[in-house]
Amino acid sequence: MAQAMASMTGLSQGVCPAAADSRTRTAVVVVRASAEGDRCAGGPRCDRLVATASSPPLSQAVHAETVKTIKIGAPPPPSGGLPGTLNSDQTRDFDLPLKERFYLQPLPPAEAVARVKTSAQDIINLKPLIDKKAWPYVQNDLRLRASYLRYDLKTVIASKPKEEKKSLKELTGKLFSTIDDLDHAAKMKSTPEAEKYFAATKDALGDVLAKLG
């Protein structure tokens, strides 16, 4: 009973031991922080902190210097493609009609022969990719150059006299047969087959180019 009365008396007076202890700790922390601030005032460490805060960041100064030295020149020239394609940015040239932007354009026979020779050389240049076994690149480049060859050879054959068309058609048929075999070898990732049909394709290209003159 006496303990209960003592507890009630403490509560009525607003005394809480935990709260009193917390206030004491807060006071100690405040006093200690104040003492730390008094000891730092005017010291060398505080001088360095003030100097760092007042100076501009180093990255900002470097960035400002870099901006001053940047020189903007003229835009680069359009990158060139195969002869007759004008440039590789043709599909993004909005001044051209859609048909001219996304489809191969017919060329005069003389220019078609020139592009046939360029495409043939590009196919011959696939040998390093075959040696490296870069099969996706072999297939992509081979199909692209073969599409140019097929299109331009049709133009050239159509311009030839009747007696020359038959022999030229036979040579081109043999050429595209070996190109298909080379494409299949690249698809199967077979190095021996790819080397075999690359040699056959190279010979067939030589026969066609010799016929064109």
Curated annotation (Swiss-Prot):
InterPro entries: PsbQ-like_dom_sf, PSII_PsbQ, PSII_PsbQ_pln. One of its GO terms (biological process) is photosynthetic electron transport chain. It is found in: Plastid, Chloroplast thylakoid membrane. Residues 1-64 form a transit peptide. Keywords: Chloroplast, Membrane, Photosynthesis, Photosystem II, Plastid, Thylakoid, Transit peptide. It holds the Pfam family PsbQ. GO terms for cellular component: chloroplast; chloroplast thylakoid membrane; extrinsic component of membrane; photosystem II oxygen evolving complex. It comes from the Eukaryota. One of its GO terms (molecular function) is electron transporter, transferring electrons within the cyclic electron transport pathway of photosynthesis activity. Belongs to the PsbQ family. This is Oxygen-evolving enhancer protein 3-2, chloroplastic. It comes from Zea mays. The gene is PSBQ2.
